[in-house]
Amino acid sequence: MAERTHACGKVTVEAVGQTVQLKGWVQKRRDLGGLIFIDLRDRTGIVQVVFNPETSKEALEVAETIRSEYVLHVEGTVVERGEGAINDNMATGRIEVQATKVNVLNAAKTTPIIIADDTDASEDVRLKYRYLDLRRPVMFNTFKMRHDVTKTIRNFLDTEEFLEVETPILTKSTPEGARDYLVPSRVHDGEFYALPQSPQLFKQLLMVGGFERYYQVARCFRDEDLRADRQPEFTQIDIEASFLTQDEILDMMERMMTKVMKDAKGVEVSAPFPRMKYADAMARYGSDKPDTRFEMELTDLSEFAAGCGFKVFTSAVESGGQVKAINAKGAASKYSRKDIDALTEFVKVYGAKGLAWLKVEEDGLKGPIAKFFGEEDANVLMNTLEATAGDLLLFVADKKSVVADSLGALRLRLGKELELIDESKFNFLWVTDWPLLEYDEDADRYFAAHHPFTMPFREDVELLETAPEKARAQAYDLVLNGYELGGGSLRIYERDVQEKMFKALGFSQEDAQEQFGFLLEAFEYGTPPHGGIALGLDRLVMLLAGRTNLRDTIAFPKTASASCLLTEAPSPVAEAQLEELNLKLSLKEEK
């Protein structure tokens, strides 16, 4: 078999007159009665191959048996297309290959999905036949971008003198965060490894080990409830460095991301990226990962509401809650009463009891609650919300967390429905100064907002013992277009501070020693100040490739129920395997 001389998508007019050897899949076959045209596809694109009895009767006879997705080896001569046959939508649209020989390397059954970017297959069918789904050009291009992003990051970190170091996949189960995936030990009866949720502790120990600059394209595992931008196993760009300040880490990441955007996407983004404190993000956008491609910020009306005539507003403020509103400019005529009812049901999903609304008309405010506002109050509302005729004003009065969640989500919905978002924009944002801890009323304890190894502000260390809820974290999240790309922080590197953190989280001394004794001891051997960040590679590629589902950026992903439709994992194992591990199943009965 002759070697391939050209990729299908790379045969151009420069090759006219040459004999070429092509190998690929049949995208489409057209029989025009005496002539057969085949679109031959490989990962670079498509080229048209013509089977003509005047060129080769033998090749034409073989072509008559060929169907879609057959794998072919074609030998032929490159010729220019006639003037009326030129297809400028194809890179190879000015030429075609006159086949002299063809060899069927493999036949194919009729495929259960259409191998094309606009396939009509459901996602379940695509995942079951993932090897066919991956043949679609849009899928290959996504993974080519993933490769380019990873290569750019590796090259950048190499120039910054980072070492790529692999950390263990079989490790120790620790509390906090999501549930671990557990792996039973055959050698140690009744004991389990855990698959890492992140390399957090090991990368900190590498800093203790004097490596100073580490990175890893790390596989991570979390047994958590899934959604469109979550998977049980995922890849993160894990980075840690000693002796750097927060500003130095953020500056380095900005330089890395601007290079990624330019090299992998061909887009210039300017640095430094904007920075916003967590409290400001929540106040202005109702989100810790705001999409800043459009405005429509939340406005706090609590002071006004406390003295207005609308009891729903006043009682919310009196009970310690707040009232906030968003002004959907020019949207009054676009939302009927039925549409607003749908918005009301939408905010209820986020805990809101309802959605108050007003439309601004030339002669004043109109809507179910307009009667509660006199002329003076109406003017204050209009001025505060910068409202003009044609605007739609939407209000939520509730607990602060409910107001933020519901209006933050409503803002995003309106941004999409009103087409306010410029999809060509890439808006990066740092969210900084996070709370160190979050209180869970159900569990009656504090949890780490990021993780238990995040350094508090120096002046807040003592608050861990006196007022933990007030302690701020030296933490930062990188946000792109309303998605959290990753998070990082400066780390605790002193034993006494780490012990205070564990105590604030409700760990006894014994529990802390049992779970993290190796880390606490390491801190006694001259641990340097250090910090880092972890960026979600899958999510970054999803955004750059314009995909809406994380599964499209992972070669063999899991479904929303954490199963693989291709291999049918997870699956039962043989009784002998369980016996070898000294395990016995005790399954709960379905109710």
From Swiss-Prot:
Where on this chain does L-aspartate bind? E176, R222, H450, R491
Per UniProt, where does ATP bind? R222, D223, E224, Q231, E484, G536, L537, D538, R539
Reaction equation(s) it catalyzes: tRNA(Asx) + L-aspartate + ATP = L-aspartyl-tRNA(Asx) + AMP + diphosphate
Leader peptide range in chain numbering: none
The record's subcellular location field reads: Cytoplasm
**Entry EC no(s):** 6.1.1.23
Its keywords, alphabetically, are:
Aminoacyl-tRNA synthetase, ATP-binding, Cytoplasm, Ligase, Nucleotide-binding, Protein biosynthesis
Region Aspartate: start and end of each range?
A: 200-203
**Which biological process terms from the Gene Ontology are attached to this UniProt entry?**
aspartyl-tRNA aminoacylation
State a GO cellular component annotated for this protein. cytoplasm
Keyword Repeat in the entry? The reply is: no
Q: Does the keyword Protein transport apply?
A: no
Pfam family example for this protein?
Answer: tRNA_anti-codon
UniProt site positions, description: Important for tRNA non-discrimination: G84
What InterPro entries does its record include?
Aa-tRNA-synt_II, aa-tRNA-synth_II, aa-tRNA-synth_II/BPL/LPL, Asp-tRNA-ligase_1, Asp-tRNA-ligase_1_N, Asp/Asn-tRNA-synth_IIb, AspRS_core, GAD-like_sf
The record's disulfide annotation reads none
Chief site of localization: cytoplasm
Q: Which family does it belong to?
A: Belongs to the class-II aminoacyl-tRNA synthetase family. Type 1 subfamily.
Subunit composition? Homodimer.
Protein known as: Aspartate--tRNA(Asp/Asn) ligase
